[in-house]
Amino acid sequence: MAIKKTYRVKRSKDFDQIFSAKHSFANKKFVVYKLNTNQPHFRVGLSVSKKLGHAVLRNRIKRLLRHAIAEFKPYLTDEDFVIIARSGVETLSFEEVKKNLKHVLKLSKIYVDGEND
């Protein structure tokens, strides 16, 4: 599963807009900033610091995040958001990444479904 480019935040100006909205939510592994927009669908930006490791490791983290977002796609609200990976995420398995990401997206009310888990 992949996320189309129309579902990604790419421009620095867009990242700055989302950060300046100051709607942030966090858990131990991820920080999420969100911005309400009039888009027909969500857009996501990913940020993985060089402090987390070399390029191969950072790209692995981004691949895992994109794959998890693709699985969550039917449950995501039409907002722009940026996911920032925190230290410790580099050792997580895909299932752990999904669990932690789902938790922080539910906190931010970006992920909505009928479940209460």
Curated annotation (Swiss-Prot):
It catalyses: Endonucleolytic cleavage of RNA, removing 5'-extranucleotides from tRNA precursor. It comes from Lactococcus lactis subsp. lactis (strain IL1403). One of its GO terms (biological process) is tRNA 5'-leader removal. One of its GO terms (molecular function) is 3'-tRNA processing endoribonuclease activity. RNaseP catalyzes the removal of the 5'-leader sequence from pre-tRNA to produce the mature 5'-terminus. It can also cleave other RNA substrates such as 4.5S RNA. The protein component plays an auxiliary but essential role in vivo by binding to the 5'-leader sequence and broadening the substrate specificity of the ribozyme. Pfam families: Ribonuclease_P (PF00825). Its EC number is 3.1.26.5. It is an enzyme of class 3 (hydrolase). The keyword Nuclease applies. One of its GO terms (cellular component) is ribonuclease P complex. This is Ribonuclease P protein component.
